[in-house]
């Protein structure tokens, strides 16, 4: 693939330089406004359009040891959470550079590992104060509130988002981009929602309402006082409960006032919009899929006697390139594509209930289940092996067809591959056979239709056959949805089946993979938010809190070091402990620099600033104010309240009542941080090439540099 290359200095840490190089390629994927890339193959000159970190790494040369470690970390995050991958890759690069700087200053590796690990654990504990509980989502569903109503008020430079038709509203909100991914709502004690835009945005001087600010701080920080920390990795990082001040490492404290009120999110549409991060079209489909699952559960359980759980394993996608995006929708049942040659079969079956058989493995003559032992000492001698193969498969296909006729089966779902000859025979006899069906789909039809999955067609009996399945075209005019591979979309469903299919369409075939990836990212965000029953306040608040707390911690560590530097050699018996006191402030500041780079790039990518330097300067201004306040979380909430005061001075405050909040999922974000730092520290500790001594100083300049091709 044609990608950039980077000069590598062999005097420095090779593994960390490679990680920084890989991470540099994915900077444009950070944030809600992603810039797509074209990857061109040098050999065949074919190009691929990508807009996600996972697809990018698939196109890079990751054959090196560090590249394989990076790929494993990204795949682990993607396979589990389907979100947080861009954050992981960016922090890998930022923290690799931070570790390189520490090495350049002579900080011992053991100190780097220890302090950075404890620093990240500390951040994971501190961000608990920005948790928003998500409870009783389905008990408080508002049928009058729709996703489209909230989407209408989103303003963004992104082409796939709608812009309000009210030009006065656009002028009032000039410069505020992608409200759904950069806004925040906090409820005060009176319950009235207060809308506020992203924290890190240039603003004019405003006067804050002190009473409102105090109420907001009390409301959101109350949970911190009564919550015991879960992540305790060091005796230096324990937190004291039920006190006026919350204890932090080395005397770091936040003074908070206890209150019985905490902010909660109890609306599905509000939660979905807040987690969409600007991708409204995909999240709207996900929200509709959850609604269908909930309605089906209510019917099956009698008004939901048991708590409803969103089952993401029963959500499927069907991609149909070539159709307009307006054709995308969500339907109950299973939608898939079959060959156009099945058109007369479907017309024959669509007006009648169909009996179904489920085959677990392949439906071929030579298929044998896992663990099958072939009989020994059996030889077949024939003059023509081709005649043997043809006649054998023909006889087998005829036998399968006779079984289907005997039990009046017109629909066969196969988890594996299907014999082409059998498919032809079934089409002629008006029977539909579909292969490569997902195991969850098979299980859903088994539960709803009363069928039993079997490994071989010879195992089929009356008890294994299900009934009541409906087969129909997805559209009333099937020829309108024929793709370039001559396939048509059909719908399979039966009463009570717990399956939902999202039909994804796009006129540009190259963008279908992007659309499907974005759908699953939104689906997993909503899934983990509902599963964990909590989310983070979004819009950069979590990362800024980490940045601020680490800077305060570093300054306090520096003061302690200066206070005891005159006698540390005499008072300390441990070299590690004494070195820790000296280098701890430096390592913490470099760790915090990773968060600052993250926020600067995020702001730059959203086009709020002309350069990353300008964005970094603005963040530095807020950082100084937050550290001076002594309570970063209180400062964050206070800044939000100031923005509220400015917004509600406009004439459109009545319309802003419907502007959505922004949220982040908790565990996927924390795990992305942890995996990024673990990878960097692993590369640091496993790279044994340490360049020191006279032998290396005698190398010429050509030996000390090289190229890393991506």
Swiss-Prot record:
GO molecular function: ATP binding
Chief site of localization: other
Subcellular location: Cell projection, Cilium
One annotated Gene Ontology cellular component of this protein: cilium
Superkingdom, natural source: Eukaryota
Record keyword Repeat present: no
The keyword Nucleotide-binding belongs to this UniProt entry's keyword annotation: no
Pfam families in UniProt: Cpn60_TCP1 (PF00118)
Function: Component of the chaperonin-containing T-complex (TRiC), a molecular chaperone complex that assists the folding of proteins upon ATP hydrolysis. As part of the TRiC complex may play a role in the assembly of BBSome, a complex involved in ciliogenesis regulating transports vesicles to the cilia. Involved in adipogenic differentiation.
UniProt cross-references to PANTHER family, sorted A to Z: BARDET-BIEDL SYNDROME 12 PROTEIN
Quaternary structure annotation from Swiss-Prot or TrEMBL: Component of the chaperonin-containing T-complex (TRiC), a heterooligomeric complex of about 850 to 900 kDa that forms two stacked rings, 12 to 16 nm in diameter. Interacts with MKKS.
Sequence similarity: Belongs to the TCP-1 chaperonin family. BBS12 subfamily.
Protein's UniProt name: Chaperonin-containing T-complex member BBS12
